Amino acid sequence: MNTDPRWISLATQIANGTGVTDGSKVGIFVTDVQAMTAVEAFVTEVYRRGGIPQVIASDERFDRAAVEHASVDVLATPAPLEEAAMRWADVHVSFRGMASPPKEQQDPVRLAAQRRGKGVISTLRWQETRWSLVRVPTSEWAELIGVPYETLLDEFFAGCIADWGTVAARWGRLCEELNTEDTVRIVSDDTDLTLSTRGRTWITFAGEANLPDGEIATAPVDDAVDGHITFPGTLWFAGARVTDLRLEFERGLVVNATASEGIELVNELLETDGGSRRVGELGVGTNAKITTFTGDLLIDEKILGTVHIALGRAYPACGGVNESALHWDIVKDLRGPSGYLYVGEQALIDGGRATGLLAPA
């Protein structure tokens, strides 16, 4: 095992957050060999607690091979072993290594079909297990974005290992205040989006599920999202590039989408099902220890000074009712001087700076 003690601390954090105890059935998915150090530490911790770990190892390159060669029907069918594992497990943990994307864009129709099949598995995960998704940095991704690997790794551990009880209490106070407001407005260059949160609940995410963690989130009212929002630069979804995405909303629905690259995939995702054009989640990053914008959604959505919307499935815990096989988080960086986030009349992000209860302690 790697001698860095932070891997052991991470394993303890995951086991605590998912409630692993004597007799717990723990399903573990791993998607990249570079995540195996984290997997080994966690499997050891599960055994130490008397749990029963079972590991399914795969690789994102296998998914790419499927998109290239499998039939659309096969792509859209949930993987039977993964489905059985979800139904067996009390706890599910996925260790997803940040693999380098393919050199060429994959067929958007086939890629969207694959995401439909995977959406069934992810729905089972949050409905039937206590779960955690862990996005593990790799040297490949560090090279891709031009950042030293040790920098990514240090921010990863800082964003995973924390006194989450204290963090949850602090952000819980902010959520209580936000629950008294009815509207959210996101403003930046070529962005002015208003969302209603009337009757919905803000909740904290503090070490229980996704790691790295640190956000507050709610589910906007389904038919009350209006305006437009842009996402400059490149973001990644299932290994596919989407560049300079712009979405326009009317009465809760995406009515127009443009991008300088990847628009075919965006349009296919929007047609996933009846709920995929609606915003299922509005999130605000709260983790001041993560500062590097990586292009990876699971990490960037935690950065203090960012907001994100998720097209598709809503979290019932927030009062959301939108159903979809899709849950696509898209991160907006508001840390520049034109970035503002208003909840009611108060600015939580003012000219790129987190203010009030959102400001770092």
PLM region spans:
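Internal helix-turn-beta structural module
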Residues: G295-P360
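Short, glycine-/Ser/Thr-/acidic-enriched flexible segments
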Residues: V33-Q34, M98-S100, T138, R200, ...
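Oxyanion-binding "anion nests"
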Residues: G214-T258
